């Protein structure tokens, strides 16, 4: 298990303090703000910079250049754009694919019943898909939340069976 400190809107000195306490993974969802913060992290080479949230296509290049992982790829089109930028930057980036298990229209992500599209993502070069993620519905109903994560587990198991390997965590 990895703890990710979401540091958006927090100043760099707070992030430095958490790093000194042993935290090694930070999450940001604003590319421009993150790039400014990352200038102060040069003395923290072992900090993992994770992009979280919706990645707009006009921010892909800067995101690939600045981050170690992208934790919210919501479409094959965006993944292919990330792949092209990784090729340009001569790097491979870790990816989590976002699955819309709640089926809420305002949320982005691969549809849980479209396994073929999820499997196709593993053919895209320059990216290392390390897992799936979802955003459960905002509700107090624990059963609804549990159902959302159970569906994600089912998608993972079916995709791994189709791939013939346990590639998805």
List where the protein language model places each region:
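Conserved alpha/beta-domain cores
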Residues: 1-169
């Amino acid at each position: 298990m990895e703890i990710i400190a979401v540091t958006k809107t927090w100043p760099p000195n707070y992030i430095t303090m958490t790093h000194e306490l042993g935290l090694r993974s930070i999450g940001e969802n604003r590319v421009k703000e993150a790039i400014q913060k990352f200038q102060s992290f040069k003395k923290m080479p072992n900090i993992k910079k994770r992009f979280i949230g919706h990645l707009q296509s006009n921010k892909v290049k800067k995101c690939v250049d600045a981050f170690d992982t992208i934790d919210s790829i919501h479409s094959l089109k965006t993944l292919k754009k990330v792949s092209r930028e990784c090729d340009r930057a001569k790097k491979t980036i870790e990816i989590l694919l976002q699955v819309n298990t709640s089926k809420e229209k305002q949320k982005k992500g691969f549809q849980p019943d479209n396994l073929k599209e999820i499997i196709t993502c593993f053919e895209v070069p320059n990216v290392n898909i390390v897992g799936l993620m979802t955003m459960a519905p905002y509700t107090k109903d624990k059963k609804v939340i549990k159902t959302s994560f159970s569906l994600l587990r089912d998608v993972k198991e079916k995709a791994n069976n189709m791939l013939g390997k346990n590639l998805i965590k």
